[in-house]
Structures are given as structure tokens and as C-alpha cells.
């Protein structure tokens, strides 16, 4: 089974990468952009989807500072 | 007293850590695949880029065989010092509270930093004779973060050991935190590098007091 894990900085934690990109966009003429956040995407094939959450908790994300979202492609 | 200095693929400061530890005692390297800590009295988790720092700094190293033994050693009260990448590894292993995030300036930054010693009576600062410490820092993932309840508990238990002096917090660490210990006081991590400040040749010997304090703690416990 194919799965994607989206990992992003928790709300309220300074995200300097997102801020830098947000500042760059108006300079290129893209107006009206807010709340830019940059995270990671992990794509993987798994036999047992129930393992994804413990994988995220233990390794793929750091739950102290990151939120994660599991997306399954059946 | 004998220090064990871990060596991971990608470590780069383990030789300086060995050299610094040998200024105050015996020391040997411990390879990441070894589970045997060879009877050492204290552990140093050194700086570098363990396992390439893939995914997050320190995230993969914490699952290495040697770290399983270090976690058991720490839980049994053994002294563990984590420097830079070693600090990141100890946070990932949950031996220390909080996490280290990319520097607010988004750059790898190398500079001499001035540190305030907040807690003087610890196993890692007891040999310090007062005043600021001048120690080099060099990292790109050094922004310390802990959530509000964790931070409050850390303050209550005297776990914030070192802070960047005013104007020195280049990485954006919360509350200028540069070094923290666990609640039991036997595990300590800091982003700056005391092992690079043990000889006048490199401009400062302020880092020696960290290693000397650990020796005092180990030998005091033996008496």
C-alpha cells in the first residue's frame, strides 16, 4: 500500500523557512499570500498501515515540534 | 576516572572530545555498533553529523546499538554529556527535554559565544570558578525549543544550566537557552563546544571546567 506522511512545524513554532518564502513571494509580484509553512513529505510503501502512526511517533516526525498527517492511497 | 566518547559515522568532534577528556582523566572511543560501554564512568556524545543527520539532526543516531546502552546507563544515573549533535541525539532519545530546530538565521554559523552559567552546583559546572564562559559554537540546527509547561518545569527544577549572554543568541533559542540538564541532573547537553576550548592555543580554556566537573562528580560519588 502506498502512503504519504506530511510533516509540518507545529502551530506557533517559529518557521524561518516559511517566513523567508513568504517574504520572497511579493517581491516576485505574488500578492495576498499568508501563513506559508514548510515541512517534509515522506512517501513509502507499507504492508501494514497500522504501523504508520508508531513510525511517525518514533522516527518520521518529532511530535514535540512537528504535526504529521498520514494519507493512504489504497 | 574514564570517559567513553561515542563515534558515529559522521561524527567529527570525537577526537577533540577525547583530547579534552584526557586533560582530566582517561578516555576511549566507543563505536556506534558496540553495546559494551567497557566500564567507563561517563559518556560523551560528540558533535558532528551522525548518520548524515538525515531526516532530523540526531534522529537516527538515537536508535544505534551504543545509544541503547547509553540510555540504560543514563537511566541508572550515569553521567552523560552531549555536545552539539550529541545534544540533538540526547533530545531525540528523550533523555533531555525539548528539541533543536534550524537556526532562526537559516545558516550554518560558526562563532565564539559568551555563555552565562545559570546553575553552578551541577555535575557539569561545579568546577567552574565564576564568570562567563567563552566557547565556540558551530551549527545549523541549534535553536532550542520546549513547550511552555516543559519550560516551566525546567525552571522549577534548575534544569537550564547555560544561557547565551545578551546579544549572543544567534540561533534564536527560546529564552537564550544554550545548555540543559535532565531533572535527575546526570544528563547534560549544550550546543557550544567545550571540547574546542581546552587549550590557550585556540583562544580559551573555558571548556575544561565541564570535563573537570564531571570528574569531580564521578570521584565524589566513589568516596
Q: What residue spans do the PLM features occupy?
A:
Chain A
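Long, contiguous binding/interaction regions
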Residues: 2-41, 47, 53-74
